[in-house]
């Protein structure tokens, strides 16, 4: 089952502070006490609200690139699919999220080596995945 969620036509602006200091993934340093600007996640993730929808990922064929089952994908159906893009596609009546290969032959590539490459005879691309949203803590 594929769950599609369309954003509001005019996203409500909701900002949070964006700190100028980068946060190292190693040993922490004291954080600065100031912000560079306000960050609106709608503006950051959604370039074209009327052409954007959200899809929840299911499965683990793309986990090596950080897309896990249950993650939310931001998909822009107005983006022109290009070599190497992550796309939402339909092939053989099934929806899938895969990396698009255009040359030398059209293929849908899983990132997880446990899954086969798909060489569809017919392919419809519904949009280009422009962002993943991954929660690190359950909200239950």
Curated annotation (Swiss-Prot):
The active site is at residues 61, 98. The record marks 25-26 as: Cleavage. Gene3D superfamilies: Umud Fragment, subunit A. This is Protein SamA. GO terms for molecular function: DNA-binding transcription repressor activity; sequence-specific DNA binding; serine-type peptidase activity. PANTHER family: LEXA REPRESSOR, LEXA REPRESSOR-RELATED. One of its GO terms (cellular component) is protein-DNA complex. The keyword DNA repair applies. Keywords: Autocatalytic cleavage, DNA damage, DNA repair, Hydrolase, Plasmid, Protease, Serine protease, SOS mutagenesis, SOS response. Belongs to the peptidase S24 family.
